[in-house]
Amino acid sequence: MNTHFSKVKGFLLGLNFNIIKENQEEGIFVVEKENEGIKNLIIGVANPIIIFEQYIFKIKEPNHEIFKSLLQKNRDIIHGAFVLDESGERVIFRDTLQLENLDANEFEATLNSLSLLLSEYSDHIINFSKY
């Protein structure tokens, strides 16, 4: 796992992400790139996969229209998807990739997808977080 962890750290630094926290033993990074809307993105290096999770908002009052809109938007997301956490109240962006052949382009594509999603869908996200 040390090799994968080091590779991921190299990708993050090469893409100018700010590493807030890292724990090699647990395989966890917490990163941000606020100019792209990414804050407290959790990246888990868990051989054989890497997991990206970005908290988006909390659903205060579950609403059919919110869930419908999120599922419809999932179809447009290039990499990753909206998911709910175990409580069913927190909306998270999540993506997973295989570590074995992970390259910088794949890694960056997930981060670009998240950034694009946050910029294109920000008005909806803000509105949903008010419910």
Feature locations, PLM:
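A short, solvent-exposed beta-edge/loop patch
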Residues: V83-S113
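Long, continuous compositionally biased terminal/linker segments
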Residues: E34-K58
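Long, contiguous binding/interaction regions
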Residues: L116
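C-terminal partner/receptor-binding element of secreted or periplasmic proteins
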Residues: S119-I125
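Beta-strand-connecting loop/turn residues
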Residues: E25-G27, P48, E89
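Charge-rich, low-complexity N-terminal segments
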Residues: M1-I38, D76, V83-D85
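Short, highly charged C-terminal tails/helix-capping segments
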Residues: I126-Y131
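Short, internal acidic amphipathic alpha-helical interface segments
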Residues: I51-R90, T96
